[in-house]
Amino acid sequence: GNTSGVNLDAAGQAVMDAMKKCNPEAVWVIQAWQDNPRVPMIQNRKAGDMLVLDLHAECRPQWGADWSEWYRKDGFMQHDWAYCMLLNFGGNVGLHGKMDILIDGFYDAKADARASKTMKGVGITPEGIENNPVMYELLYELPWREQRFTSSEWLKEYVQARYATDDATLHQAWQLLGASIYNSPKEKTQQGTHESLFCARPGLDVWKASAWAESKDYYNPKDVM
């Protein structure tokens, strides 16, 4: 948005004051998306008065990962924050996930001297649910596991828990899914699953349906079909 002429520090304090007036124990839950929350709006707020949701941490983390497109040098400063997975955009239905990045990002944040001090947990921030349940299972196990693990290791246990059997065919199928369509690479910042070209405006050079989507495979389709 356009912040021209807005005293962001004063605006942030006004919001905080209004919340505290209604409830002295109020905590401002705020989303981290692109340039928001603006640094001047939050830098002078008291520690403990705010919880920042790192909305798209599995793809564009803002807690301080220097490889991120939305890198913040100082992360969320003194404020508490949650490591969140967005995963689903617009309620689109399709297989998609970033298993390795989700796992490594969480443990990288735990190992970071600054980010680890204020990380309070994990969260989900999807625009649609009832698909890709394996990703939510994975996310919510992260805080319970002290040591870093691989997606391949985790999927072995997931298969046994889900199907109550140690079937080799099931293991093979999930290992293929976990290494392909559920392991979108770091450089892919598409917003959720592939979109159908039939949803795009007709044209001779159409290859995606929306500005932030993809239709080009980052995996071998033979591993999914």
Language-model region placement:
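Catalytic-core regions of glycoside hydrolase
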Residues: 1-178, 183-191, 198-224
